């Protein structure tokens, strides 16, 4: 569906050149929700502008839905952009138009007849859950409702791809989850390919099938979301994952417990997928002469399955603890020893 081949984008500035996207190659499959995550300045927004043809790469190829976006011009470029919907962080609605009129706007530009246009707008209003609000103006809507209008407008021309540029960054957590649920529903109903730009790992965890991590204009890591959560390779990826599963207050709380356990060890157990549903602690206590104390834990659901972290204290003879840890690892659970007082 989307292919980037050795794409580079260099901007010329007064004090020299700036490489915003640096030799990026990427494959995004048809019908998947693909996340691109990175901190500010990583090159994410430039990358999304390359996908919709608002920017041309300095070198490399960008192919979207069979069209080489580096070569198309004029009418063909306008046609290509109609097949690429986009939603924004700050909604970009026309404040003098109602919900209905905002959604109809791209259809007017495309020259769709009025009767067909009205029918399509009605379908979209129902799809995004705005029935009863079609005659309201943007100033009368909540942030979540404004973004629903933005999503409906982006879908007006039946695009093959939906680009989301920090689409939930301006929303509160509850509204963010509602918008993410809507995107998942649209993906399932329409088979739409969604590319999502964000700096929030929560967004990636909740709805994405695969993820690419950007830093300094480069893709430094990519893969299925559960795999990246289970085995992050790059320091930046580890920071993103750690922020989600082990916030600073958790780390401080665990470190304060070290003095309370003068023997045994404290370990972090990471469960992914099917392993998160197994009665692991029960089996460890049954099979080995160790005492297990659960200090803290959390299980989250990703778009692909469960992901959990458990902090435990194990006490007993050294060889029994070692055997227990070996057993845990053989159950496809990652083990990291946080504190060893044996």
Curated annotation (Swiss-Prot):
Record-level GO cellular component terms: plasma membrane
Positions annotated to bind ATP: 38-45
Pfam families: ABC_tran, NIL
Domain of life: Bacteria
InterPro entries reported for this sequence: AAA+_ATPase (IPR003593), ABC_transporter-like_ATP-bd (IPR003439), ABC_transporter-like_CS (IPR017871), ACT-like_dom_sf (IPR045865), MetN_ABC (IPR041701), MetN_ABC_transporter-like (IPR050086), NIL_domain (IPR018449), P-loop_NTPase (IPR027417)
Subcellular location: Cell membrane
Broad class of where this protein is predominantly found: membrane
Keywords annotated in UniProt: Amino-acid transport, ATP-binding, Cell membrane, Membrane, Nucleotide-binding, Translocase, Transport
E.C. numbers: 7.4.2.11
Ranges where the ABC transporter domain occurs: 2-241
Reaction catalyzed: L-methionine(out) + ATP + H2O = L-methionine(in) + ADP + phosphate + H(+); D-methionine(out) + ATP + H2O = D-methionine(in) + ADP + phosphate + H(+)
Protein's UniProt keywords contain Acyltransferase: no
Entry function: Part of the ABC transporter complex MetNIQ involved in methionine import. Responsible for energy coupling to the transport system.
Family: Belongs to the ABC transporter superfamily. Methionine importer (TC 3.A.1.24) family.
Quaternary context: The complex is composed of two ATP-binding proteins (MetN), two transmembrane proteins (MetI) and a solute-binding protein (MetQ).
PANTHER family named among the record's database cross-references: AMINO ACID IMPORT ATP-BINDING PROTEIN, METHIONINE IMPORT ATP-BINDING PROTEIN METN 2
Name by which UniProt lists this protein: Methionine import ATP-binding protein MetN
């Amino acid at each position: 569906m989307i292919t980037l081949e050795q794409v580079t984008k260099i901007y010329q500035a007064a004090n020299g050149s700036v490489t915003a996207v640096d030799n990026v190659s990427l494959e995004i499959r048809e019908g998947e929700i693909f996340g691109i995550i990175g901190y500010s300045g990583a090159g994410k927004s430039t990358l999304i502008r390359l996908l919709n043809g608002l920017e041309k790469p300095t070198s490399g190829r960008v192919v979207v839905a069979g069209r080489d976006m580096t070569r198309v011009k004029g009418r063909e470029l306008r046609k290509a952009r109609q097949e690429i919907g986009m939603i924004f962080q700050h909604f970009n609605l026309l404040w003098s138009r109602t919900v209905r009129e905002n959604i109809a706007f791209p259809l007017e530009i495309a020259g769709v007849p009025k009767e067909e246009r009205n029918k399509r707008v009605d379908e979209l209003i129902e799809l995004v859950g705005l029935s009863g609000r079609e005659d309201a103006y943007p100033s009368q809507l909540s942030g979540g409702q404004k973004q629903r209008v933005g999503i409906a407008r982006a879908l007006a021309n039946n695009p093959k791809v939906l680009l989301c540029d920090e689409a939930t960054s301006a929303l509160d957590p509850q509204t963010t989850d509602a918008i993410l649920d809507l995107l998942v529903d649209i993906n399932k109903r329409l088979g739409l390919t969604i590319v999502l730009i964000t700096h929030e790992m929560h967004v990636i965890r909740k709805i994405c099938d695969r993820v690419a991590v950007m830093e300094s204009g480069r893709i430094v890591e990519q893969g299925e979301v559960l795999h990246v959560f289970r085995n992050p390779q790059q320091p930046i990826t580890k920071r993103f994952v750690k922020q989600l599963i082990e916030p600073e207050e958790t780390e401080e709380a665990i470190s304060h417990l070290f003095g309370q356990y003068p023997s045994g060890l404290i370990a972090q157990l990471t469960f992914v997928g099917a392993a998160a549903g197994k009665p692991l602690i029960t089996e460890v206590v049954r099979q080995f002469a160790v005492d297990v104390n659960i200090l803290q834990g959390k299980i989250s659901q990703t778009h692909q399955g469960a992901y959990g972290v458990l902090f435990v204290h194990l006490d007993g003879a050294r060889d029994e603890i070692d055997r227990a840890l070996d057993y845990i690892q053989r159950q496809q659970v990652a083990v990291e020893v946080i504190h060893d007082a044996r």
